[in-house]
């Protein structure tokens, strides 16, 4: 059985983009592999470290646990844990920081994108070291597979480099993890301009109610050149059809819509209404489970507490191996006269 690690920063409710990115993959593989799902609260400090932002963290962590369980993550099988509750990760990150050069980190494209999204004019040390901490997350769990979106594949590649260099210097301690990419490309936002994001206001959340989903779908960007239903439209690059492909299980219906859309024989409203129905059918069981879980705060706390304990046990095993390999294991004290 292979070991899996992936997770999310607690910055808001999960949305369809998360599901299409790696969450759907997690659900499919949790019965086949040993899964660790990290709530990466330390990673949020790289772009959200103000006092007011930190005060929001407990509620955001709770939202993430709710979304995980509502989607179908099985807390009996998988380990759901809070990054900051496992102090070994920062110890391992410091060790790894000595195996990676600054120019190598500067070549990771997502770091500049994160800095721009957070309106940072300069790259803080913490953000520059984000991939190193991520490597520590992955290798502390001794993970073999890392479900990620395409935009984070470079982070997994860096993790492989770190593991290879450590193993070459000190002996075989870590597996070489590989990225497990979603079958779905990065899901664009409802505005068609960028990937789905809470901060950009272009997200459909997994917890959105039926009417909210319908309203957001009706407002979705389509083909701007198509001003009438009888004008042939573009399916490629059209967010409405990207969402149909990702979430509408009726492939015959989707294929028929595409054929008619290209021929100018169906209007945007009909295609969007069908999408809203498909999304609400997909989201309804998630909403129902979430409503039940919201009434069980003690259970939510227990899931996280038990997950943190299980991960701490694994972290101690890993760090013992790391220190023994490096010659850093505890030695008897020298009693000076």
Swiss-Prot record:
Catalytic activity: tRNA(Trp) + L-tryptophan + ATP = L-tryptophyl-tRNA(Trp) + AMP + diphosphate + H(+)
Motif 'KMSKS' region positions after renumbering to this chain: 195-199
Residues the entry annotates as binding ATP: 9-11, 17-18, 149-151, 187, 195-199
PROSITE patterns given in the database record: AA_TRNA_LIGASE_I
Motif stretch ('HIGH' region): 10-18
GO biological process, one term: tryptophanyl-tRNA aminoacylation
Annotated InterPro entries: aa-tRNA-synth_I_CS, aa-tRNA-synth_Ic, Rossmann-like_a/b/a_fold, Trp-tRNA-ligase, Trp-tRNA-ligase_bac-type, Trp-tRNA_synthetase
Keyword Ligase among record annotations: yes
Binding site for L-tryptophan: 137
One GO CC annotation: cytosol
Function noted in UniProt: Catalyzes the attachment of tryptophan to tRNA(Trp).
Subunit-level organization: Homodimer.
Protein name, as recorded: Tryptophan--tRNA ligase
Organism of derivation: Treponema pallidum (strain Nichols)
């Amino acid at each position: 059985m292979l070991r899996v690690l992936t997770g999310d920063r607690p910055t808001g409710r999960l949305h369809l983009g998360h599901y299409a990115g790696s969450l759907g993959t997690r659900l499919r593989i949790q019965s086949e592999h040993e899964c660790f799902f990290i709530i990466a609260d330390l990673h949020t400090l790289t772009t959200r470290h103000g006092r007011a932002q930190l005060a929001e963290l407990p509620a955001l962590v709770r939202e993430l646990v709710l979304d995980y369980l509502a989607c179908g993550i099985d807390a009996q099988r998988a380990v759901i844990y809070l990054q900051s509750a496992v102090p070994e990760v920062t110890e391992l990150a410091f060790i790894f920081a000595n195996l990676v050069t600054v120019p190598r980190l500067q070549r990771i494209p997502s770091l500049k994108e994160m800095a721009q999204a957070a309106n940072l004019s300069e790259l803080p040390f913490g953000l520059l070291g984000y991939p190193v901490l991520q490597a520590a997350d992955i290798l502390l769990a001794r993970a073999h597979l890392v479900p990620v979106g395409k935009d984070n594949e470079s982070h997994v590649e860096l993790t492989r480099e770190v593991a290879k260099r450590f193993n070459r210097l000190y002996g075989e301690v870590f597996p070489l993890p590989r990225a497990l990419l979603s079958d779905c490309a990065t899901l664009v936002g409802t505005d068609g301009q960028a990937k789905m994001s809470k901060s950009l206001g272009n997200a459909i959340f997994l917890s959105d109610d039926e009417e909210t989903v319908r309203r957001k779908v009706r407002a979705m960007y389509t083909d701007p050149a198509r001003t009438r239903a009888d004008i042939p439209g573009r399916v490629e690059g059209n967010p409405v059809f990207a969402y149909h492909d990702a979430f509408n299980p009726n492939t015959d219906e989707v294929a028929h819509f595409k054929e008619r859309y290209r021929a100018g024989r169906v209007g945007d409203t009909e295609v969007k209404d069908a999408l809203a129905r498909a999304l609400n059918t997909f989201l309804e069981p998630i909403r129902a489970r979430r409503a039940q879980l919201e009434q069980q705060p003690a259970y939510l706390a227990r899931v996280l507490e038990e997950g943190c304990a299980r991960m701490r046990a694994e972290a101690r095993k890993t760090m013992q191996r790391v220190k023994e390999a490096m010659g850093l294991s505890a030695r008897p004290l020298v009693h000076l006269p």
